[in-house]
């Protein structure tokens, strides 16, 4: 298994439980920002920069986002296990986000 390279994204992030999905259209117009939108039968969630004001949502603030540099092969195993074990051992909550080419994880920085 190769050594992981990480990049800490510069802003703080919030996790929102949305009551209105229309907010996504305005985020799509912004350039060069990280956000993640997930919708299921149970809820719709958004992770975005804490400076972006989202109305009509429940939110959890104070998350830092870290990007894994380089593409990970789909068949590569144990990477998330290594990362989440380190976080768990230090008492840190972690959330992972995977896109087609890039992987991210968010860690709770404070309450």
Could you tell me what each predicted segment is?
Residues 77-78, 89-105, 111:
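A cross-kingdom feature marking solvent-exposed beta-strand/loop segments within repeated
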Residues 50, 108-109:
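Helix N-cap/beta->alpha junction signal
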Residues 1-90:
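Regulatory modules associated with amino-acid/nitrogen control
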